[in-house]
Regions:
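Non-catalytic cap/lid and distal C-terminal segments of serine-dependent acyl enzymes
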Residues: 2-281
């Protein structure tokens, strides 16, 4: 991992700081962007950190601008870390042709198929390179108290990454996650291209498959809007609920009439998610 990071901008926010950064990634072999909200408590000691994984078409800016999380994070003393959703500018033919695959659609996995396998390594980026970057540049973030949460594709990422790395990310929650990607068009498109035709390999990145062998762990919180246009075809929270029940894993899926898939929905329930993580960390 390269130690150099470039500060693109920095802004005072609720007594803390929001910063936007770029660094050269070893995992993706491209520049990678991320943002960090550092709460005021970080001036006096270590604070827990929450890594937020955004969804399709989003960037490291989306959550910081739209989610409205900073005020409560400042009160609770939580650092917020938001990586980008994929490599950018890898130069792979076809990576910019559709909104649900390639650029801004890295699916938080390590691709095994050419030409994607060289750059599309978001799983290793989130679980290895980003924590090392935080440890090197943000000593106030307590690396023993990290949580992960996300939205849609990022909810899929949060669930799978926590299930596979419970000692790294000790708490988890999700907004409208792609909870059973092997059963939906988004997941099938991504997995078949990034991972190849062998569906056994897909199970390593499907939360509804992973939880069967990882039943123990902290409670999982999921919020889902019932006016979400992607609910029936793409998200399938009921499959994850059933898998958790079979595995004995504590999960709460809250369904909300009238709420859609966007950031008005996320902002409406952000407080509950931040408090969920603050309690667990």
């Amino acid at each position: 991992m390269t130690d150099a990071i470039e500060t693109r901008s920095s802004h005072a926010c609720f007594g803390g700081t929001v910063g936007f950064f770029t660094h050269q990634s070893v995992e993706t072999k491209t520049p990678m962007n991320f943002s960090v909200f550092t709460p005021p408590q970080a001036k006096d000691g270590k604070v827990p950190g929450l890594v937020y994984l955004a969804g399709l078409t989003c960037t490291e800016e989306t959550f910081m601008i739209k989610a409205g999380a900073q005020q409560l994070a400042a009160e609770l003393g939580l650092a917020l870390i938001c990586p980008d959703t994929s490599p950018r500018g890898a130069g792979i033919e076809g990576e910019d042709e559709s909104w649900d695959f390639g650029t801004a659609a890295g699916f938080y996995l390590d691709a095994t198929q050419a030409p994607w396998s060289t750059n599309y390594r978001m799983y290793s980026y989130i679980t290895q390179e980003l924590p090392a970057l935080l440890a090197a540049h943000y000593p106030a973030v307590d690396m023993d108290r990290l949580g992960v949460f996300g939205h849609s594709m990022g909810g899929h990422g949060a669930l799978t990454i926590h299930l596979k790395n419970p000692d790294l990310f000790k708490t988890v929650s999700a907004f409208a996650p792609i909870a059973a990607p092997m059963r939906c068009p988004w997941g099938n498109k991504a997995f078949s291209n990034y991972l190849g035709p062998d569906q056994e390999s897909w199970k390593a990145y499907d939360a509804s498959e992973l939880v069967a062998s990882r039943g123990t762990g902290p409670a999982i919180l999921i919020d889902q809007g019932l006016a979400d246009g992607f609910l029936e075809q793409e998200l399938h929270p009921h499959h994850f609920e059933a898998a958790c029940a079979a595995a004995g894993r504590d999960v709460t899926v809250r369904r909300h009439a009238g709420y859609d898939h966007g950031y008005y929905f996320i902002a409406s329930f952000m407080e509950d998610h931040l408090r969920h993580h603050a309690t667990g960390l």
